[in-house]
Regions:
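Conserved N-terminal structural module of periplasmic/extracytoplasmic solute-binding proteins
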Residues: 2-178, 216, 222-231, 238-243, ...
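Loop/turn elements at helix/coil->beta-strand transitions in domains of secreted/extracellular proteins
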Residues: 31-35, 60-64, 84-89, 101-104, ...
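Conserved small-residue motifs centered on glycine
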Residues: 40, 370-500, 509
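Extracytoplasmic/periplasmic substrate-binding proteins
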Residues: 41-48, 56, 144, 150-159, ...
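Short beta-strand and adjacent tight-turn residues that come in two discontinuous sequence segments
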Residues: 69, 92-93, 269, 289-292
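Carboxylate/His-rich catalytic cores and anion/metal-binding grooves
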Residues: 101-129, 183-187, 197-232, 237, ...
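Helix-loop-helix "hinge/cap" segment bordering the ligand-binding cleft or interdomain interface
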Residues: 134, 139-212, 233-288, 344-386, ...
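Structured mid-domain segments that build the active-site/substrate or prosthetic-cofactor binding neighborhood
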Residues: 284-288, 296-405
Length: 541
């Protein structure tokens, strides 16, 4: 903890040195406003003289210096900021910062900025109103005006390497039993990689707040989408606790069985996030349950450098449920998964609120979105005779060059963007969502796998699902519960019990006895207080 606090203090000290209101003269003598931002997630820094950042600044008259979490806990960093009372211009707003009076009410300023006011529907904005009646943050992801396009499954799934599927003849895998049977068979026949590195059959991420892929799997196995905190019966509108279902007991019993067979990675429960990524980066992990964004962007450059696609080490998701006949809902349409519990906020330390609002508004212009996610025409992408964007081989190579990306591309990734199609109605807002370019730029083993299953992208491997109801996703409500409230304390206690007990349950020699002890301690936390609150939120929709 001491190390975390020191690291957080360093971050805060950096912010104090960056506090905004500063301007400078660009080479053409046009005044460029300079803003600062801290996003309480891990992210990639770009070069100070980044090409696209400078290009956008020359067009809109402003730029923003972004900083990210580095080796510290999110809550520690936010609490350290609150303790100083000084903030960068922009932060990833959430309940704790709202309660600390650190944020300005965006809805008091947005009448002059239709790009912001019309970014969401009135109904969607209402979900963001805080107890005082105002709106303090803007969700950056999942907002699409017009047609939506989806290629990636950015969420949670049981992932498996393409080499395992290819070895087995690309079988149909739909249950948790089939998933582990396949991994067991493969590792028995192929205990090592070609370089004699021992294969790791199955692992998972259990570090700190990222442990959700350990605890929330039962909801998916029962065919429910990622409400994140509960399951909701769409007919009765009743909240259900996925932690105590028969499926939960069966699933963790299965992990216990796989642990004792040597299939489940014994080091998973003590590994840090970085150690987990290091393990995946070897190419030796055959399968895991995780959310795409937690692993892909970290391991993809390593896989490319080591040419691991040639060995079939890339991952694809499988539509796994607890039993055959259950419709899987691992993938819900991206537009339905807006997280209302956090988003971009302007802080009370910002000395140019109107300028900050204009900066956000300008970033939502279609031409600027094109530059954020496609780059410069002729340099980063080309245009055919029909106006369709595509990448030449040279441009595709640049996209895979991390040094080039750091020096050249600037997506302002945690600022709001309009997804779906650009204003031209032809091109997707980002290359990752342009079907032809998406497939062409996939590793060779992914292309072979898609062809074998008759699909063109990751989403088609799972299938699409609409939002189950107006309440979805419920984690927008659970993540907004004040930690000091009775409900917040119960939620924290339940999480602590799960973090402590689930690894013990999986490793126990007597699973039944360990499960009973776990359930006894879980129920002692009065979970009904938490789930009654969630039911109340359902009833209000």
């Amino acid at each position: 903890m001491k190390k975390r606090l020191v690291s957080a203090a360093v971050t805060v000290a950096l912010f104090i040195g960056l506090i905004a209101g500063v301007t400078f003269k660009a080479s053409d003598q046009k005044e460029i406003k300079h803003f600062t931002a801290f996003f309480s997630v891990e992210g990639d820094n770009i070069d100070p003289d980044n090409d696209i950042k400078k290009l956008i600044a020359s067009q809109i008259g402003a730029e923003c210096e972004e900083t990210w979490l580095v080796g510290q806990d999110k809550d520690d960093a936010i609490n350290s900021l609150i303790a100083t009372g000084e903030y960068p211009d922009f932060v990833l707003g959430e309940t704790a910062l709202y309660e600390a009076d650190a944020l300005i009410p965006i809805d008091e300023y947005w009448d002059d900025y239709p790009n912001i006011k019309e970014y969401l529907s009135d109904e969607q904005w209402e979900k963001l109103r805080q107890p005082d009646g105002h709106i303090y943050w803007i969700p950056p992801f999942g907002i699409s005006h017009g047609d939506d396009v989806e290629m990636l499954h950015n969420g949670e799934a049981f992932w498996i390497q393409t080499r395992v599927l290819k070895w087995a003849g690309y079988p149909k895998i739909t249950t948790i039993e089939q998933y582990f049977d396949l991994i067991e068979s493969y590792v028995q026949a192929n205990p090592t990689m070609p370089d004699e590195t021992e294969n790791i059959p199955f692992t998972m991420l259990c570090d700190d707040w990222r442990y959700f892929c350990l605890e929330n799997v039962p909801q998916f196995l029962d065919g429910f989408p990622n409400d994140g905190s509960c399951m909701v019966d769409t007919e009765t509108k009743k909240v259900m606790d996925y932690n105590v279902t028969d499926t939960a007991k069966r699933y963790f019993g299965k992990l216990n069985e796989e642990f004792h067979k040597g299939i489940m990675d014994p080091g998973a429960f003590n590994a840090t996030y970085d150690q987990y990524l290091d393990k995946l980066s070897t190419g030796a992990v055959l399968g895991m349950v995780d959310q795409w964004w937690q692993f892909y962007y970290a391991i993809d450059p390593v896989f490319k450098k080591q040419n691991l696609a040639q060995l079939g080490c890339d991952y694809v998701p499988l539509p796994v449920t607890i039993d055959d006949g259950i419709h899987n809902r691992w993938h819900t349409n991206r537009m339905a998964e807006i997280d209302y519990s956090s988003g971009v906020s302007i802080t009370t330390s910002c000395k140019d609120i109107e300028g900050a609002m204009k900066f956000i508004s300008d970033l939502l212009e279609s031409d600027i979105i094109r530059e954020r996610f496609w780059g410069e025409e002729g340099k980063d992408y080309s245009v055919d005779e029909n106006g369709l964007f595509y990448l030449t081989n040279e441009q595709a190579e640049k996209k895979s060059d991390s040094s080039y990306q750091t020096a050249h591309m600037c997506s302002y990734s945690y600022f709001p963007r309009v997804e779906g199609m650009l204003d031209d109605g032809i091109n997707a807002f980002s290359m990752e969502f342009q079907q032809d370019e998406f497939f062409r730029n996939q590793p060779v083993d992914i292309q072979e796998c898609f062809d074998a299953y008759g699909v063109e992208n990751y989403v088609e491997l799972l299938g699409k699902n609409d939002a189950p109801g107006s309440w979805y996703p419920m984690y927008s409500y659970s993540d907004s519960i004040p930690t000091t409230s009775e409900c917040g304390k119960v939620k924290n206690n339940l999480e602590a019990v799960k973090k402590r007990w689930l690894p013990q349950v999986i490793m126990a020699d007597d699973f039944g006895a360990a499960w009973d002890q776990y359930m006894e301690e879980y129920n002692a936390c009065n979970p009904h207080i938490y789930f009654d609150y969630l039911q109340q939120k359902i009833n209000e929709n």
